[in-house]
Amino acid sequence: VNFLDNVGNYIKTFDTKQNDIVVESKGEEITNIVNYIVQTAKEENVSIPQLWLPRIPNMIYTEELKAKYNYQAVTNNINPIIGEYDDPDNQRQMLLTLPISKEGNTIVYGSAGSGKELMLSSIIYSTITSHDSKEVNFYILDFGAETLTMFRNAPHVGDVILSTEKEKIDNLFKMLNQIIEERKKLFVDYNGSYDFYINHGGKQIPSIIVMINNVEGFLDTYNEYEELMGQITRDCLKYGVIFILSTNGPNTVRYRLRQNFKQNVVLQFNDASDYGTIIAGVRKKEPSKVYGRGLIALEGIYEFQTAYAYKEEKLTEYVKIICEKLQTICEYQAKSVPTLPEVVTSSLLKNSFVNLQQVPVGVNKETLAISTINLAATGMYTITGEDISSSTQFLESWMKLLQSRDGIKCNIIDANNILNKNNLGDIKCSDADQLENTLNEIYEDTKSVHIFMILNINSILNKLNVTDKGRITGLLDKVKSKTNVKIIIVDTIDNIKTISYEPWFKTNVSLSEGIWLGNGIANQFTLKVTTSSRVLRAEVETNFGYVITKGKAALTKWITEE
């Protein structure tokens, strides 16, 4: 650039060439402004409230949630912690509990691997660590991975039943029906309600929670119980009985049964459209792909995370330790599901031996109660069957049980020597020729109760002449005046039929009472049995028979030696 004066002379000259300066690009201006503000805020330690809370962690623990939310259990109100839910609209995260006592039956939904067993274990753990075993009892049917067996030793848990234990499953439902019938009668004066009974002066009785893990597996194997479950779950809450089921899909539980379940807990489904089948108004909302995440419908629809009882890798060990500690704390042990013992022993029956009105002989197969007979009603009692020689173990074991009771003396006449005398201990067992002497001896002793068993009496009488037979039958008939003597007549049904018309027998024996050994009871007409012949024609196993009481026959497993 040249500067000139007024006559054209150069006054000053400048060089306009500039050096190129490279400036680093830092992006758009608005971005740099924001970054500058953020950096300045950090330096000045300035912050503003977040729009939402941090997401719930993948691993949360029941005990930590109890402390965080100051959870306090209420006696007889079963409301266990199951996790924590997120309510971003109101910027809050809240404790998630399952109001079992209030809302009752519950279904836990979720695809395989979604955390259903975690949810069930959380329900059990939170309940047993917050309530006494007098308040709540669990009966668990584990048709899944069988991980719930870790709770087996808790005093609150009556039984953990696996898929192969058919007898226990049968007996559980019998027991539930019995409990409900008993409570119906018990609650008559308390508005027919468990809650009203508990809160208004009734005795403490536990809520019963029946938990079925993998209910579709249960119903596939035992589909005969679907209708019964529908009947029980319809009104069971008012009797203090609650069902909790877990299932893989939204339609695996039929609507007729599903309508009896008020609460739904939904974990992850493989198909996003399945959420709307269970939760109305869910739209496109889905839980995060995290184990134990799910959706729950409360005031709105919220995502939740299931709580762990303990660190996953040590969960089983921890739960077993807790169960052992609870055993030392809780005085009451939940009643186990009764089962028919493999061997009915004297130790099992002896406490039921109250008096001659209740003499135990075995276990009722249907009710699993101790079967008893009444020896006090008449002077004689009959034990019969098509073949008595196959039931000698029962006869020997039963007589030893009678002999073990103070004040009772037992004697046996074994006409055909079918018993093993070595198995009778100190019981006197004589041959047929000692019948008269034995009768005279026991009639003379009025201080003791005498149980006198005569086997194959018909063969004894058939060998006697008219005079001797008259003398023996006269002695037998004398028992009606001896209240301390009871004669047990053991013979085949054909022989019982032969002597049933004789006066000494008719006077002292009731044919609507007695014991039948083995099969064939439906083929005879000597004993007065009113039970359906269709029932009586069923095949009877070894060591089984019928106790006949007032004409009704009850299938019974007999006492045998241990």
Predicted feature locations:
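Conserved AAA+ ATPase core "coupling" helix
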Residues: 172, 271-281, 510-513, 518-531
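Conserved P-loop NTPase motor module
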Residues: 1-102, 218-221, 225-227, 263, ...
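Phosphate/diphosphate-binding loops
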Residues: 273, 278-298
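P-loop NTPase catalytic phosphate-binding loop
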Residues: 68-192, 200-269, 286, 347-512, ...
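Generic detector of well-ordered alpha-helical segments enriched in charged/polar residues
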Residues: 31-39, 170, 258, 275-279, ...
